Amino acid sequence: MKKIIKEHFFEHRAVLNSVVELDGSIEKVANHLICCLKNDGTIFWCGNGGSASDSQHLAGELVGRFVGDRRPLKSIALTADSAVMTCIVNDYGYEQIFSRQVDALGSEGDILVGIT
C-alpha cells in the first residue's frame, strides 16, 4: 500500500511540473475568460461523468464567490438541468446535449469550456 501511495505522489509531482510549462497558455485562456465576463458575456461549462460535476462546481464559484466578495459573474453549467438534458437526448440524441443549450442560451462573445 505504501508503494502505491508513493507512486501516486510521484506521478502527481510529474504532472504539476509539466503544468508549469503551460503558464503562457493558461494566461491566454484566463485573459479570454476575463474579457468575456467584462463584456457582460457568459461562460458556459460542460463535461460528462465527474467532469460534469467539475463544470457545475466552476460555474457555482463564478456565480457565488471564490475569493473575496464581488458581484456574481455570468456562468452556467450545461450539466445541471436534468429535464433539459433528458429532453434533448430523447428528442435529438446525445450528440446535441450541449450544442442545443448553447443555441438557446448563448450569445456572440460567450465562451464554452468543455472539461474532460
Whereabouts are the PLM-identified features?
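Residue-level recognition of alpha-helical structural elements
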Residues: 1, 22-26, 51
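Glycine-rich, small/polar surface segments that engage phosphate groups of diverse ligands
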Residues: 35-106
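C-terminal binding/interaction regions
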Residues: 108-116
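Generic N-terminal amphipathic, Lys/Arg-enriched alpha-helix
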Residues: 1-21
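A short, well-structured juxtamembrane/interface segment
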Residues: 20-39
